[in-house]
C-alpha cells in the first residue's frame, strides 16, 4: 500500500485527509456485535429433502444474528453474549418453503471472577414457524416486521441482550 503525503504548504486540508487515511488503515476496528450465537438446525425428522436447504438456513441465520449490531452499545469480541438456538424441524413444506419447528433458546454469561458460566435464559419455543427459501437474504427492519424468521430471531436477540444487561446492573 502506497500512501502519498500532500505538501502542507500547498494544501492544509491535504494533511488532515492524509492523517484520516492513515488512521483508517492503522487503527483496528472494534467489534460492535453483541451476540455470539451457535445455531443448530436438526432436520432428522424430515425425509426426502435436500439437506443443503437446512445447511444454508443455519449459515444464513448465524450470519444474521452474529454480524448484526442490535444496539448502539460497543462490545469487544470477548464480551459478546454466548447463546445458542437449537432448532428442530418437525415439518417442512418445500412448495411454500414453510418450516414448522420447535426451538430451544439458551444464553449464558460468565460468573464474576471465575472461569464458570451460568445460564441466563433457557426456553423451549414449541411454535417456531417461518418461511425461508434457499439463498434468501435476511433483512430486518425494526419499524416494519415483514418476515417471521427475522422477527423471531430479533425477538430473542433483544431479549437475551436485555437480560444480559440486567444481570450486571438493574435496568442495564
Task: Identify the residue ranges that each predicted region occupies.
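Acidic/His-rich structured neighborhood in mature extracellular/periplasmic domains
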Residues: 100-172
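Bacterial Sec-dependent N-terminal signal peptides
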Residues: 1-35
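Start-of-domain marker
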Residues: 33-100, 111-113
